[in-house]
Every structure is written in structure tokens, then in C-alpha cells.
Amino acid sequence: MAGHRLVLVLGDLHIPHRCNSLPAKFKKLLVPGKIQHILCTGNLCTKDTYDYLKTLAGDVHVVRGDFDENLNYPEQKVVTVGQFKIGLIHGHQVIPWGDMASLALLQRQFDVDILISGHTHKFEAFEHENKFYINPGSATGAYHALENNIIPSFVLMDIQASTVVTYVYQLIGDDVKVERIEYKKS
């Protein structure tokens, strides 16, 4: 695995207000020592959840969600992992939520290869004009005002040279389903 960087992307956990904890099946998959970086789209909402993430990886980046108690989290962040510049926002700033044109504008403002946003509690990953966009969804499947059927999800990015292999983990019923999406920097 030389040259690989594993990045865990997750957010909208809403612990303990909407959910007690991460699904047990996700916790089993998230083993300390395997992941180098964590990018979190916010709404953790407490220090306990942050401390748990710190046990999984030394390098944890969090942006502030609209329900986060810690006001010291920045609104936005740009992180470089390998050859990739990655922008991180919670997503409540994107009007309308999840809007492609608004996301593309932010991507250009941040000048990033990958833009990660959350807030909608709905997983998405797609390429648009040679840039890559990820919304990891809600890792706990926390409810959302606009969405009834929330599927718990998180994303692992395997970054190697100019390629990112994105693995999406979704808890559908009792089974963890994994989907693989590849993005090459042009």
C-alpha cells in the first residue's frame, strides 16, 4: 500500500441529538491505524464524537455544521492530500442545498480538484467539468427535514498519484453495500 493515502469522509452524525452513535457495522469497518486523514463535513455535534474520530486517524479536519457546539471549527477548509487539493464545507451555505451551479462556483473559488460538502444527508459522488464532487451523506442516517428515507453512509477515498478511488459504504437494511467510483485528475 505504499503511496496510498486513505481518507475517511463523513459528516452529519448529529450525535446525540438525533442518533446515539454510529451504526455498529460501520464502527467495525473503521479500524484505528488504517486511515491517514479524516475530512468531516460537520454536525458531529459534540466533543465526544470528535474524540472518537481522533482515535481513527491523527489528521482530522472538521468544518462547522449548523448544529455544531464547537464554534471554533472553520466554515470552510482546503486540505492537500497527495496531488489533490480538497475543499471541505458543511453545505448549508449552498443555495439551494446541493445545487450544482453553486457547488461548481465554490469549487472554482477554492480552486480545488475535489469539493466535499454535506448537509443534505444524501450521498452523492460525481464528476463535473473534470472536477469531483462528494457528499458523504449522514454517517448515522440522522433524519433530515427534507428527506424521509435516510441511508447511513460514509466514503473512503484511496488516493494514489493522480487517481482517487472512492468507496461508498451504505447501510441498506442490515447489509453494508459498497460502491466504487474512480476519478482521475486530468
Curated annotation (Swiss-Prot):
Residues in coiled coil: none
Membrane topology per the record? Peripheral membrane protein
Q: Which keywords are on file for this protein?
A: Cytoplasm, Endosome, Membrane, Metal-binding, Protein transport, Transport, Zinc
Tell me a GO cellular component: endosome membrane
Please give the Gene3D superfamilies that the UniProt record associates with this protein: 3.60.21.10
Main localisation: cytoplasm
CDD domains in UniProt: MPP_Vps29
Gene Ontology molecular function: any one: metal ion binding
What's an example GO BP annotation here? intracellular protein transport
Q: Does the keyword Cytoplasm apply?
A: yes
Q: Where in the cell is it found?
A: Cytoplasm; Membrane; Endosome membrane
Has the keyword DNA-binding been applied to this entry?
no
> Known NCBIfam families for this protein?
yfcE
Q: What does this protein do?
A: Component of the commander complex that is essential for endosomal recycling of transmembrane cargos; the commander complex is composed of the CCC subcomplex and the retriever subcomplex. Component of the retriever complex, which is a heterotrimeric complex related to retromer cargo-selective complex (CSC) and essential for retromer-independent retrieval and recycling of numerous cargos such as integrin alpha-5/beta-1 (ITGA5:ITGB1). Component of the retromer cargo-selective complex (CSC).
* UniProt subunit comment: Component of the commander complex consisting of the CCC subcomplex and the retriever subcomplex. Component of the heterotrimeric retriever complex formed by VPS26C, VPS29 and VPS35L; within the complex interacts with VPS35L. Component of the heterotrimeric retromer cargo-selective complex (CSC), also described as vacuolar protein sorting subcomplex (VPS), formed by VPS26 (VPS26A or VPS26B), VPS29 and VPS35. The CSC has a highly elongated structure with VPS26 and VPS29 binding independently at opposite distal ends of VPS35 as central platform.
Indicate the family of this protein: Belongs to the VPS29 family.
This chain belongs to the protein called Vacuolar protein sorting-associated protein 29
The UniProt gene name for this protein comes to VPS29
